């Protein structure tokens, strides 16, 4: 929802994920947006509002790219905070990450780096199978079934 709202506000087609990602890949520069995680739960309301306040009709293409980069960076920050919270609560050795967010190359790379740094095994579906969270549920179920024999 966060990605689509920002993308549409920038004039991108809906769903906006791949279009916003294309903008984000045009730069490494950005002005940070907040990330919000409380008790292991992510809220994108604040980051989305902050991003929406930056959007105006006179934005240059590079400003749009920087905002897109900031959006995905804030999502990555939130994901890392959430995972860190949960791995402190429970012993975790593996992470299954599937859904629309994991079809994004920036977030996928970020999760790979985070998991490697924190000695977590990362299981992800191929990007074309990560466009919808229903895929994530199916992937997780298949993984559990396989691990139980």
What are these regions (language model features)?
Residues 39-45, 50-96:
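Adenine-nucleotide phosphate-binding core of ATP-dependent small-molecule kinases
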Residues 12, 92, 120:
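Short glycine/serine/threonine/alanine-rich loop segments
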Residues 92-111:
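Glycine-rich phosphate-binding loops at beta-strand->alpha-helix junctions
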Residues 1-62, 143, 147-149:
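A short helix-loop
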Residues 47, 107, 134-137:
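Residues at alpha-helix caps and immediate loop-helix transition turns in enzyme cores, especially N-
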Residues 95, 112-137:
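Conserved phosphate-binding/catalytic loops in two-lobed NTP-binding clefts
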Residues 51-52, 57, 106-120:
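Acidic-glycine-rich active-site phosphate/pyrophosphate-binding loop
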């Amino acid at each position: 929802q966060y990605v689509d709202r920002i993308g549409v506000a920038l004039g991108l087609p809906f769903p906006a994920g791949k279009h916003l990602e294309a903008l984000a890949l045009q730069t490494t520069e950005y002005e940070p947006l907040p990330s919000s995680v409380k008790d292991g739960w992510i809220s994108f309301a604040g980051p989305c509002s902050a991003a929406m306040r930056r959007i105006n009709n006179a934005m240059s293409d590079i400003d749009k790219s920087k905002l897109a980069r900031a959006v995905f960076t804030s999502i990555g920050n939130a994901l890392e905070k959430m995972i860190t919270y949960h791995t402190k609560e429970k012993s975790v050795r593996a992470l299954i990450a599937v859904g629309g967010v994991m079809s994004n190359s920036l977030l996928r790379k970020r999760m790979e780096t985070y998991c490697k740094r924190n000695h977590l095994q990362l299981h992800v579906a191929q990007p074309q199978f990560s466009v919808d969270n229903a895929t994530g549920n199916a992937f997780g179920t298949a993984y559990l079934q396989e691990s139980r024999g």
